[in-house]
Amino acid sequence: MNTVRVTFLLVFVLAVSLEQADKDENRMEMQEKTEQGKSYLDFAENLLLQKLEELKAKLLEEDSEKSRNSRQKRCIGEGVPCDENDPRCCSGLVCLKPTLHGIWYKSYYCYKK
């Protein structure tokens, strides 16, 4: 009976020690995989961040070009004298010689088209 107990105890101790070794090995393996996964995630995150910054810069550049091109510079309103050679009338207006009123000024004025 004693030999059975000793044998059982020996097998039990051996099983527990092997199980502990397997757990440690598995834990180390999982830790390595996690670290590798983090490095891959960091790389992917940096790559995505660079692409987003490039897109943002491109969009801001296009917006600034649009606003620069669409914005009207200082212009002359309707009924205001303008220069025939350099008309700065606002959009929808043209620099014309006045008919009837204002002929005595010998100047051009901005009128609607």
UniProtKB/Swiss-Prot annotation:
The keyword Signal applies. The keyword Transport does not apply. Expressed by the venom gland. Pfam families: Toxin_22 (PF08092). Keywords: Disulfide bond, Ion channel impairing toxin, Knottin, Secreted, Signal, Toxin. Residues 1-21 form the signal peptide. One of its GO terms (molecular function) is toxin activity. GO terms for cellular component: extracellular region. It comes from the Eukaryota. InterPro entries: Toxin_22 (IPR012627). It is found in: Secreted. Coiled coil: none annotated. Disulfide bonds join 75-90, 82-95, 89-110. Residues 22-74 form a propeptide. Probable ion channel inhibitor. The presence of a 'disulfide through disulfide knot' structurally defines this protein as a knottin. Belongs to the neurotoxin 14 (magi-1) family. 01 (HNTX-16) subfamily. This is U11-theraphotoxin-Hhn1a. The lineage of its organism: Eukaryota, Metazoa, Ecdysozoa, Arthropoda, Chelicerata.
